[in-house]
């Protein structure tokens, strides 16, 4: 039985709205197609693009008005064997101030044998006073390949607005076959950014399968940044973390890393999404 406090929080959560987007990618005649999709609420997807032939480029659209108290968004992505999807967003995910209930975004990615996912979203912006829960889970079957980044922006640095109160619970889980993978949780509350060294921006870039040679390729780029950054290998999973005070600088850093990692991991030249040029 739920406690009184839990019942009150549940009632508050019910005051928000729900959205669910489910996408399934399949390979047909050597080309990846959006085989099926379902949506409920304002989570949408634009028509696929094919700027490089076989891989399918898709833009995921979050609610234009942002994510507010009690909202619950779920994104489910499934890649069938041999498929290759590149997903990005035309804009940031904005979590606004909440006086009570938590806004929740849950993202699940399942990658079948031999499939390839590039998950390259814009940043998630948490306004001062936001109460947010963000969970991203990736499951890779044998032979699957992954390039994925996630950017957390606490406050609005460009407007000199600090994340001086509020709470964030962020989970990043990557499951690899026969390996430990990654299970990382970050909790921030009350505007205390000591875990980030006072930096309002944190980016995590994950790539698999990687090896020592790939690690050595990215380290010189990180050394040039002039701000805290590091890279490590967890089995065949490369994990890169970067702290910053400037969102545009951080986005450029992630794109530079992607230009290096895409040929190294996927054996393909970089083909940036058109939205990056706007």
From Swiss-Prot:
GO terms under cellular component: cytoplasm
Encoding gene, per UniProt annotation: ureD
Localization of this protein: Cytoplasm
Name used for this protein in its record: Urease accessory protein UreD
Record PANTHER family: UREASE ACCESSORY PROTEIN D
Superkingdom classification of source: Bacteria
Family label: Belongs to the UreD family.
Keyword Chaperone applies: yes
An annotated Gene Ontology molecular function: nickel cation binding
Subunit structure: UreD, UreF and UreG form a complex that acts as a GTP-hydrolysis-dependent molecular chaperone, activating the urease apoprotein by helping to assemble the nickel containing metallocenter of UreC. The UreE protein probably delivers the nickel.
Annotated source species: Pseudomonas putida (strain ATCC 700007 / DSM 6899 / JCM 31910 / BCRC 17059 / LMG 24140 / F1)
